[in-house]
Regions:
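Short structural boundary motif marking the start of a folded domain
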Residues: 3-9
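Cysteine-cluster motifs in flexible loop/terminal segments that predominantly coordinate metals
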Residues: 92-136, 141-142
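Conserved small/polar residues in nucleotide/adenosyl-binding loops
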Residues: 162-168
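Cytochrome P450 core scaffold surrounding the K-helix E-X-X-R motif
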Residues: 46-48
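Short Gly/aromatic-enriched secondary-structure transition segments
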Residues: 50-52
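Extracellular beta-rich ligand/substrate-recognition surface
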Residues: 11-18
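Glycine-rich beta-strand-centered segment in the early N-terminal region that forms part
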Residues: 25-41, 54-104, 109, 130, ...
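Short pre-catalytic strand/loop immediately N-terminal to key active-site residues, enriched for Gly-Thr
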Residues: 151-157
Length: 172
């Protein structure tokens, strides 16, 4: 897609540091990616444990948030499921290899080559992913779900990650 994605995020420099609003540059979107303008993000216990480094291995500076709802702002040339203006949600994953047995069987959370978490994971470009307490996020289209009209973003965000456990990728 060849576009630079800048986003203000709510980030901590360390577990002890206060949250700060800073601007980051998201990775360049690829042809199978969706750029989302975030409208709401839920707060999950895992966000709290991670940002406080209670589970170890947190990579700082860090922006958490994996319950995301927003509007599609841009799509890559090979994106087929979404278009600009669609209402969408994102859960705890933003990518996987897509090729191993687990991924081919719809079990991307068990990717044998390492899935990419919404935050605190190594992304496809080698950077550490930053979560949804932000203005924008870049996600592989396979990890985006539709939010139907009539459901508020703040209601959809906390359940957006459930599309990984449901037999459908839509919140209907």
């Amino acid at each position: 897609m060849g576009m630079s994605i800048k986003s203000k995020v709510l980030q901590k420099e360390s577990p002890e540091a206060p949250f700060k609003v800073v601007e980051i540059e998201r990775r360049d979107p690829r042809e199978d990616d969706v750029v989302i303008d975030i409208k709401a993000a839920g707060i999950c216990h895992s966000d709290i444990h991670t940002i406080q480094n209670e589970w170890g291995e947190a990579h700082f500076p860090l922006t958490v948030g994996h319950e995301i709802a927003g509007v599609v702002e841009a799509v890559g040339d090979k994106v087929t499921k979404f278009k600009v203006g669609d209402r969408v949600g994102v859960g705890c994953l933003v990518n996987s290899c897509g090729e191993c047995e687990q991924c081919r069987n719809g079990q991307e959370q068990n990717c044998l080559n390492g899935n990419v978490g919404t935050y605190n994971s190594e992304d496809v470009d080698g950077t550490i992913t930053q979560g949804g307490y932000a203005q924008k996020v870049v996600v592989n289209e396979g990890f985006v779900c539709t939010i139907p009209e009539g459901i508020d973003f703040d209601e959809a965000a906390p359940v957006s990650y459930t599309h990984l456990t449901l037999p459908t990728s839509d919140l209907v």
